Every structure is written in C-alpha cells, then in structure tokens.
C-alpha cells in the first residue's frame, strides 16, 4: 500500500463521517429538515419528528391539532407522489431554494422530484403557520391516536 493510500484510509477512518456512530440521514429527509429550518428557524427541526399522531414515522387516528394535521397532509402528499412511476419520496432529492424564509421548488425537477419538493415545501409552510403545543410532543400514540 502506498503512502497516498494510507493517507486516504486514515482520513476516512478519523473523519466525522467515518467516526460517526449514527446512521446517515437520507438526503430527502435532510432537504426536508432544511426546509423546516428555513420557515421555522426558531425551533429545532427535531421538534417535529415526534409530534402528535402523524409527525414522524407512520400515522393513524385523528390529528391532535393543526400542526399534526400538517403532517397528516404531508403523509397523504407522499402517498400521492408514490403513484408516479418509480417515485420513492423518502429518498428522492430535488432542487429548491430558501431565501429569507421563502421556499421555492426550482424548475428542472422531474415529475417525482417536483411532487416531493412541493409536498415538503407545503408542509414546511404549514408548520410555520401552526402553533406548537409542547404537550403534543412524544405523546402516547396507543392512547391518543386511535
């Protein structure tokens, strides 16, 4: 092994990516996170990952409030995007722009990317307009989401 190969191997092993114990975030979720941070800079995007009955993985029952309803609509939007041939919203990346809290899905996205971008954009805008109730974070799904 040449010194150059050893240097590259060492860089990968000690880099933040190589040393990370957490799984990498799918690129689409990373983009959605950034959209949320664009429209709601005052809150951590993580606050929306386990909120109500629909924000986070899955979803069932009646949304607990307007913010949870934003997530329910987002879930349905992804379901519609999945009807586009070969479209998997959770891994589909897209081109967009955030400028002073305004999100724009760029032209040039294919049909799937355009649909997913619009789903994420509308959800992030909805989050910005809905009140956040701390009592609806990390709720008992079995008790409240029937």
Swiss-Prot record:
GO terms for molecular function: calcium ion binding; calcium-dependent phospholipase A2 activity; phospholipid binding; signaling receptor binding. Its EC number is 3.1.1.4. Its main location: secreted. Disulfide bonds join 38-98, 53-145, 55-71, 70-126, 77-119, 87-112, 105-117. The keyword Lipid metabolism applies. Binds 1 Ca(2+) ion. Its cofactor is Ca(2+). It comes from the Eukaryota. Residues 22-27 form a propeptide. GO terms for cellular component: extracellular region. Ca(2+) binds at residues 54, 56, 58, 75. Keywords: Calcium, Disulfide bond, Hydrolase, Lipid degradation, Lipid metabolism, Metal-binding, Secreted, Signal. It is found in: Secreted. The active site is at residues 74, 120. It catalyses: a 1,2-diacyl-sn-glycero-3-phosphocholine + H2O = a 1-acyl-sn-glycero-3-phosphocholine + a fatty acid + H(+). It is an enzyme of class 3 (hydrolase). One of its GO terms (biological process) is lipid catabolic process. Residues 1-21 form the signal peptide. InterPro entries: PLipase_A2, PLipase_A2_Asp_AS, PLipase_A2_dom, PLipase_A2_dom_sf, PLipase_A2_His_AS. Expressed by the venom gland. Belongs to the phospholipase A2 family. Group I subfamily. D49 sub-subfamily. PLA2 catalyzes the calcium-dependent hydrolysis of the 2-acyl groups in 3-sn-phosphoglycerides. This is Acidic phospholipase A2 2.
């Amino acid at each position: 092994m040449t010194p150059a190969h050893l240097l590259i191997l060492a860089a990968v092993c000690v880099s933040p990516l190589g040393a990370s114990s957490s799984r990498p975030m799918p690129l689409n979720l990373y983009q959605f996170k950034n959209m949320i941070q664009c429209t709601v800079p005052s809150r951590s995007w993580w606050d929306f990952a386990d909120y109500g009955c629909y924000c986070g993985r899955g979803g069932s029952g009646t949304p607990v409030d307007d913010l949870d309803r934003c997530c329910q609509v987002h879930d349905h939007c992804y379901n519609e995007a999945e009807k586009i041939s070969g479209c998997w919203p959770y891994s589909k990346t897209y081109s967009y722009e955030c400028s002073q809290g305004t999100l724009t899905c760029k032209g040039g996205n294919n049909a799937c990317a355009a649909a997913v971008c619009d789903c994420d954009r509308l959800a992030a805008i909805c989050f910005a307009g809905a009140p956040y109730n701390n009592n609806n974070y990390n709720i008992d799904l079995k008790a409240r989401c029937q």
